Structure formats: C-alpha cells, structure tokens
Amino acid sequence: MEKIQNINKIKQYVLSIISDNYNEGNGVMVGNKFITAGHVIFKCENPNIMWNGKKIPLINPIVFHNDENDSDSYDIAVYSIPNAKSPLVLSDVVPEKGDVLKSCSWRMLGEEYVECNAVVNGLKEGNYYAADTDKQLKSGSSGSPVFLNGEVVGILCAGNCNDDNTPCNTEWPLSLCVFLSSKVILELLETN
C-alpha cells in the first residue's frame, strides 16, 4: 500500500476521543487498530471514537499500559477496529536528533485542529524520545501521533506545558514533548 505523504490526507485518521466525563485525548487509526496513550483511556469514562460516521466504543483493548512515569514501561492503549481500513502504518524507525516530525491533533473535544512541527532533540530514555514543537501541545493532544515520511513514528504521551501555559519543569523548554516510539509499539503488538 502506498504511503500517504500529504498531512491533509493523513489527518482524517487522527481521531478525537469522546467520553462521558469530557476528558480530552486523541489517537490514530493504523490499519485496523486504534492507538492512543493509556493515560488518556484511564482518565475517560466510556471512551469512544467516531469512525466513518459511526460511534465506536473503546472497550477490551488488545494492549493496555498506563505506566506514564516509567521510561522503561509503556503508556499505550490499542484497540482492534475490525472494519477499519486505514492506510497508515507504524514505522520501525526511531527518529534521530534533528529529524523534523509532523504532529497533528484535535483539542476542545475535536473542535480545534492543531498541526505543528516537532524537531527531535536527541533526548531518549527507555521506550521514549523527546522533541521540541513549534506550537504548544497541551493535555488535550495526548495520544496523538507524529509522522515522518508518511509513517507513524510515535504517540504523544507527555508534554512540558501545563494548561495555563506554564512549564511543568522549569529546567526544560515549554515546547518539550515526549513520544512513545512506534518501534516499541510494533514490538508490543507482536507479543499480544
């Protein structure tokens, strides 16, 4: 299957998660799987997505880990969506320092589209790598993908920007974001 390079075509596979308690988050449809951050699902009551005009409840994940504070663990939830046919794929490449990734997500419960560049800064620890974004990604963007050459190379799991635009950690740039590597996600899916 040919890779989609145009972000305007890719963004249709980035979905806002809807929940009864209005917790915000995103995920991405890759093949017949919906992938997001585990902490997003953990905080949601009755999470679901809209796919092809249908409301799909997110129940019975095939992979679920909510270990967002351990770099050797995982912050991920993966759901099988049998009738989904997304052309997106997970990359087996870990981005290197200087690589420019494309991030896209939805905030305000799917009303506000956010697109930005994320430059990999070389910080890597365990299953995660960091990048500096040219727009402030906040909690509503958690679970959203980053792309390199039309492939998903990571899922946003943490940022350094509080909702009031102050840094979580003053020693790091406000634009710092942390992504779970798609290579790690592929390895997890092979064992589940």
Language model regions located:
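Serine endopeptidase catalytic core focused on the charge-relay Asp
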Residues: 11-12, 16, 20-21, 28-33, ...
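Active-site region of chymotrypsin-like
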Residues: 6-18, 23, 82-87, 110-191
